[in-house]
Each structure stands twice: as structure tokens, then as C-alpha cells.
Amino acid sequence: TLRFSELVYPDGTINRETFRRAQARDVYILKGEGLETWEPRFTYHGFRYVELTGFPGTPGLDTLRGRVVHTAVETTGSFAASNPLLNQIQRIIRWGQLTNLHSVPTDCPQRDERMGWLGDAHVTAEEAMLNFDMAAFYTNYIRDIRDVQGADGTLTDTVPHKYGSR
């Protein structure tokens, strides 16, 4: 069993309090013969830490390998400064954007919502376009927005629309 988390407690155990109702858990039954490869097909997880239980033996650092998944966008911009802190902030911004590109711009890859909030998409759009070729991505997203727009012009809070009002 793999359980994912962004935080750990002081004793090193994973802290999943910020995940709300999200299970962020995968169960895989080993065949037990040589190297095995498995990937979830209908979900993804945003995480910094992973807890592995039920593994036969002592896992090493090479026991698990993560795969980064996101909508394919090409890097078009770059940033470099003489200040290492600014360079690190830029790396964090790029990773944050990529981990939230899953056909729509999502708000968080780790919790239970992973929804395309229009406000979040709006405030990150300029940054995204400075770093990546977002033309095809936003063209598709605008079509999605148009699909949920009411006859009177009203919009939902999220696209695609899941719950709530216009």
C-alpha cells in the first residue's frame, strides 16, 4: 500500500490532515517475480512523501520511482538571476504550474477537489504564459468555459462544472 502526503510529523510519519477527504492511496499486490512496474491509470497524486507498507523486505531508495504527469506544454520562457533564492522561487513556480495542468488548470493536485476554479486559472494565466506555450491549452479551456456558460451569460465557479451555483 502506498499512501501519499505533503507533510510529515516530527516522528517522520506522514501527516495527511491537509488532504481533507482525499484517500491518496494506492494498493498493489506484488506478483513476486523480479522487477515489477505499476502505475495508476485513472488518478494522480500530488505529494512530497510516500509511505510504503506491506512490502516484503526492507525497501531501498530505488524501490519506488515517481512519474511526473501533466498536460504536455512546451517551455517557452526562462528566468535566471544572480540571486539563488529568486532562481529557487522560479523553479517552485514552474513546478506548481505543471502539477496543476491536467486538461484544465486545477487548484491543487493533492486534495479531494482538483477542480478548474476560474479564479485560480485567472491569477496564474500570465505566469503560465510567460513560462510555457499555453496557446492550445487555453484554447481548449475557453471552449470548456463556453460549454458551461448559461444562456444569460452567467458562468459557473469551476470548469468543468461539478457543483454549486452560477
Give short role names for the model-derived ranges.
Residues 1-111, 119-120, 134-139, 145, ...:
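Extracellular/oxidizing-compartment recognition motifs
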Residues 84, 125-128:
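Acidic, His- and aromatic-enriched active-site or binding-groove loops in soluble protein domains
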Residues 117-123, 130:
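An alpha-helical repeat/solenoid feature that recognizes helix-turn-helix modules
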